[in-house]
UniProtKB/Swiss-Prot annotation:
Residues annotated to bind L-isoleucine: 61, 96, 98
Activity regulation description: Activity of CodY is modulated by interaction with two types of effectors: the branched-chain amino acids (BCAAs) leucine, isoleucine and valine, which are signals of the nutritional status of the cell, and GTP, which may signal the energetic status of the cell.
Name of the protein in its database record: Global transcriptional regulator CodY
Record key words, sorted: Cytoplasm, DNA-binding, GTP-binding, Nucleotide-binding, Repressor, Transcription, Transcription regulation
Protein location: Cytoplasm
Domain remarks in the Swiss-Prot or TrEMBL record: Modular protein made up of an N-terminal effector binding GAF-type domain and a C-terminal wHTH DNA binding domain, separated by a helical linker.
Chain intervals for the UniProt region annotation (GAF domain): 1-155
Length: 257
């Protein structure tokens, strides 16, 4: 397969995800397919965003890493010290992705590291490993292209996350501001009673303890549910199950006291 064909295959995958979050596992599998390598896509803090490995590489240590979806902190630090592409790293180098405890299996292995950059900052690392054969110039071109594309996707996801947080905060603020004094007091007591982000509420018990009517509690919950801040479900005589949908709600409620 030519370099152009390999690049097109990677582009085809990304076009499928246009407008939605990219599954980095799919990206890793595509990179693995077109480069015939083992692949790790790692965040700057060492989280494994995506990977594609052959069975030979799956030692006990690697399996544990995959289960935890995190690489060891010392290896993360070493990766972050790599400022530009480093190619054809052998098994005896501390940057090898292959398990040194199985050195005899990977004596001819080669690791290549591509820093993932975007928006002027380091976002992570693309690590490719081959059991045999050096990485050639075409491999390096494709790897650097893949790292650039991954960087753009990570940035897009970060921006989407920031936008979502801003929307959530606005919705939470509007919901809290829509509550009357007594409704807000009722909500504060409800979540003190729950002691967390979800649980079972018996409205009459809270109403009696706080000295407000049950209808105040019902109205307050309805306003929050309409704003998409919480969800509630009646369990009949057992009470009402309540769950917070927007994770910053309790923090904002505390700030508003």
């Amino acid at each position: 397969m030519s370099l152009l064909s390999k690049t097109r295959e990677l582009n085809t995958l990304l076009q499928k995800h246009k407008g939605i979050a990219v599954d980095f596992k799919d990206v890793a599998q595509t990179i693995s397919s077109v480069t015939v390598t083992n692949v790790f896509i790692v965040s700057r803090r060492g989280k494994i965003l995506g990977s594609s490995l052959n069975e030979l590489l799956k030692s006990q240590r690697i399996i544990q890493m995959l289960e935890e979806r995190h690489i060891p902190s010392e290896y993360t630090e070493r990766l972050m010290e790599v400022k530009q592409t480093e190619s054809n790293i052998d098994i005896d180098n501390v940057l090898t992705v292959f398990p040194p405890e199985n050195r005899e299996l990977f004596i001819d292995s080669r690791t290549t590291i591509f820093p993932i950059l975007g928006g002027g900052e380091r976002l992570g690392t693309l690590v490719l490993g081959r059991v045999h054969d050096d990485f050639n110039e075409n491999d390096l071109v494709l790897g650097e292209y893949a790292a650039t594309v991954i960087g753009m996707e990570i940035l897009r996801e970060k921006h989407s996350e920031v936008e979502k947080e801003a929307r959530d905060k606005a919705a939470i603020t509007m919901a809290i501001n829509s509550l009357s004094y007594s409704e807000k007091e009722a909500i504060e007591h409800i979540f003190e009673e729950l002691g967390g982000t979800e649980g079972l509420l018996i409205a009459s018990k809270v109403a009696d303890r706080v000295g407000i009517t049950r209808s105040v509690i019902v109205n307050a919950l309805r306003k929050l549910e309409s704003a998409g801040v919480i969800e509630s479900r009646s369990l009949g005589m057992k009470g009402t199950f309540i769950k917070v949908k927007k994770e910053k709600f309790l923090d904002e409620l505390e700030k508003s006291k």
